[in-house]
């Protein structure tokens, strides 16, 4: 493998890792505050892609379609939290897992009924369809660089929200001890709705940005969800910092393994080795730390 190819794959790995971070931090926030493992999180990724496609059909402009899809995704999440999740907060973890898994099945069938089973390709915005030379001899797509930049900005805004605002203080306090937050007279129901909407917006943002790179189709969020859960386990359940580190680890490890493993192993099992690479990484991390790299400590 040439140095140029290695550099390009590292860029791909970082971009993929940052997308996984947007997904994983949403799962982390929901679990940290609401104590719910949301198995419907991948569906929110899928919904973001479909809403972008529909918004493009209505407006014909990415400048209008992207914010429209983003806002619509947040509204879907608010309705979902109020109607479906809110009655489950006092139920056991099994009920919550079954309910959110049922939502995944529901959304997969719903988009099939509305838009059909066929994969729907989305065009990359013409303004971002070119490529730039990142180093002499290495050309990289502009759109992937934009995705990386947007994900970094989103992460910085999230960091500012959590560490520098009143809402962020409530999120951090609720993550440590939600009983005390409730005792202080804070509207926990509203806090839950805001947290779930924020997590859904991050997942939808990932789906919106990945839509032009992937064909939008029913179930597109399912494999993303599985990888996201691997990221959360590696980083530590409930840890935002762990979500970032775990996402970058998985993104780089998965991307580079798909290039390096076929160079080392030329057997029929090569594809299987590539597919299990991130699970091997997860097993190694758990071997040394049963709670992940940065497990959150709760009061």
Predicted regions: what they are:
Residues 1-22, 51, 59-65, 91-97, ...:
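Membrane-interfacial amphipathic/re-entrant helices at transmembrane-helix boundaries
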Residues 11, 33-79, 83, 260-268:
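Membrane-embedded helix boundary and interhelical linker motif in transport proteins
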Residues 16-17, 137-221, 240-246:
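Helix-loop-helix "hairpin" substructures at the membrane interface of multi-pass membrane proteins
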Residues 27-49, 90-95, 167-170, 188, ...:
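Short, non-helical or kinked segments that cap or interrupt transmembrane helices
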Residues 49-54, 70-76, 103-111, 150-159, ...:
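Hydrophobic core segments of alpha-helical transmembrane domains in multi-pass membrane transport
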Residues 60-103, 110, 245-250, 254, ...:
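Alpha-helical transmembrane segments within multi-pass membrane transporters and channels
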Residues 60-62, 66-71, 193-203, 207-208, ...:
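Transmembrane alpha-helical segments in multi-pass inner-membrane proteins
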Residues 88, 93-164, 191, 263-277, ...:
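Transmembrane helix-bundle core of multi-pass membrane transporters
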